[in-house]
Amino acid sequence: MSFFNPPANSNHGYNDDVNTGYNARMHSKLAEREGFHLGNGSDEPRTLYVGNLDSTVTEDFIATLFNQIGSVTKTKVIFDGSNDPYAFVEFSDHGQASQALQTMNKRLLLDREMKVNWAVEPGQQQSKIDTTRHFHVFVGDLSSEVDNQKLREAFQPFGDVSDAKVIRDTNTTKSKGYGFVSYPKREEAERAIEQMNGQWLGRRTIRTNWATRKPGDQEKPSHYNEKSYDEIYNQTSGDNTSVYVGNIASLTEDEIRQGFASFGRITEVRIFKMQGYAFVKFDNKDAAAKAIVQMNNQDVGGQLVRCSWGKTGDTGKTPGGSYGYGYGNSSSGGNSQPYSGYGGGGAYGGGQGGGGHGGPGQQQSNANSQYWQYYAQYYNNPQLMQQWSNYWQQQGGAPQQQNSGGHQ
């Protein structure tokens, strides 16, 4: 007879259809009545339900077994006569309880498969843990077969993984080849980054790095960060979710996503290498505003980036047109502002007001005029000036500056 065997496959206990005998509502009430810590609100649970036990088990036996995983503070075995005995096991913290859940669920104990789950109210066990102040690790070059579970398992040896997510295309659900792993402790994330970089996961070697600046790091001085969230939020229309990111130099899409992923779901990243900027589009305005407030003049992949609102140019919409990004003058005739518009043929999107550029089927001469105007508008930016100077040297010289009227 086998005393204690590992499980045939991994299972984390959540929504476990084979976890017969477990009743979340009933067992959570019983655990609460016995004085176990279940957690509520921001207080994370640390008590487990352990079911399908042999009738010979004792509280000392269960406590000794689970103490191999973490510090057990309380144990109670329930014998109700009509069903197999079950137990509640409380740990000193959520991380140890989570590790025990993943390690012990479906293990054979006295030839019986243990059923381990959180002893919490229905729905509470699936509530998302707030990882805002946790430490986030970017994982790149993931092979297509790696899912959330495999990602979590690969990084579990380095600490209590609070979240693991493979980023997928919203239309095809296929993996985009990267993901994020979160830890509540800095040293756990640092250890994972150091030891997992270049390791094999699935069919490929992976890259690891910080997903964004680490919580608790000193903020770099920034006059922009002196503005409040409300000020930034109210600077643009209610449906704007586009963030302009300047000074990106040679940053890749992965690196930009790393830097901004912690603020919310990113729906699109468009990069304009020659101009030295990108647009990051979020699925809601709140996430975009937070990104601007916190990331302006912050380090992303070794670059100190500048962040402000992108501006959606609806006047550039054309049937069947694709996204185009560029700079246009505001309708008020004020300073130029970066915007993300809809343009034809993947060229530069139409701007607002008299200084707009865009439209399908533009000729090369018009395109050259556009380049010149972008250069002229941002003549006071030394980095952009150097980029354009290099470009025109390659083109054999800059064209004569056009009048300020728009090009249609």
Curated annotation (Swiss-Prot):
PANTHER family per UniProt: RRM DOMAIN-CONTAINING PROTEIN, TRNA SELENOCYSTEINE 1-ASSOCIATED PROTEIN 1-RELATED-RELATED
This protein's record includes keyword Nucleus: yes
Role description: Acts downstream of ced-9 in the induction of germline apoptosis under different stress conditions including starvation, osmotic, oxidative, heat shock and UV stress. Plays a role in the formation of stress granules in response to heat shock and oxidative stress but not in response to osmotic stress. Required for the formation of stress granules in the core gonad but may not play a critical role in this process in the oocytes. Plays an important role in the formation of stress granules in the embryo. Protects female germ cells and embryos from heat shock.
Protein name: Cytotoxic granule-associated RNA binding protein tiar-1
Keywords: Cytoplasm, Nucleus, Repeat, RNA-binding, Stress response
Tissue: Expressed in the germline and also in somatic tissues. Expressed in Ggonads and oocytes. Expression is slightly reduced in the most proximal oocytes, especially the -1 oocyte. Aggregates mostly in the head neurons, muscles, intestine, vulval and hypodermal cells during heat shock. Expressed only in the intestine as a response to heat shock, starvation and dietary restriction.
Domain of life: Eukaryota
Annotated organism of origin: Caenorhabditis elegans
A GO BP entry: nuclear-transcribed mRNA catabolic process, nonsense-mediated decay
ATP-binding in keyword set: no
Domain RRM: 46-121, 135-213, 241-312
Location of this chain's protein in the cell: Cytoplasm; Nucleus; Cytoplasm, Stress granule
Cellular component, GO, one term: P granule
InterPro entries cross-referenced by the UniProt entry: Nucleotide-bd_a/b_plait_sf, RBD_domain_sf, RBM42_RBP45_47-like, RRM_dom, RRM_dom_euk
GO terms for MF: mRNA binding
Outcome of gene disruption: Reduced lifespan, impaired stress response, delayed development, reduced brood size and an early behavioral decline with uncoordinated locomotion at 6 days of adulthood. Have smaller brood size and 10% embryonic lethality at 20 degrees Celsius. Produces 2 to 35-fold excess males at 20 and 25 degrees Celsius, probably due to increased X-chromosome non-disjunction during oogenesis. Shows impaired heat-shock response: only a 3-fold increase in phsp-16.2 expression (thermotolerance biomarker) when heat-shocked compared to a 10-fold increase in wild-type animals.
Upper lineage: Eukaryota, Metazoa, Ecdysozoa, Nematoda, Chromadorea
SUPFAM superfamilies on file: RNA-binding domain, RBD
Pfam families: RRM_1 (PF00076)
